């Protein structure tokens, strides 16, 4: 048996894993290419090297593979230049994660980091403003202009961000909730 699903589609493919480096994500250097179906030309899967308003998603200790996959899809949908994951985040190559990315895993570069605060400091040295999602953020998300280089820091489903990680952020933002909803599940 080669599938982990009950009713596989009967299709098998081999895909090379690409291992990105943080430096590639920050510099926008091509780490890989794909062919644009419309033009037939090879294009970088990391994006425009000259892009000034870079956007990153930093996630800490995400446990559910489906949630991580959803974050990849959301990252691609908003034009994220990369996703940075703490070393205790679920395996990006978990079959459920891969399925839930709906292919975004092949188009959005990503790295794992052993030192999330150290990585945040590297981003800050590269003039990237770090916004931490926090239930008790100092301001609501719509109080800021995100047109500059930005990274959004999202914590784990059950505990949110660790205090020391949240303290590394430049700003803490909240998303107002209606009703009795407390968070957006990561």
Across the structure, where does each feature detected by a protein language model lie?
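Post-transcriptional modification and biogenesis factors for structured RNAs
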Residues: 1-186
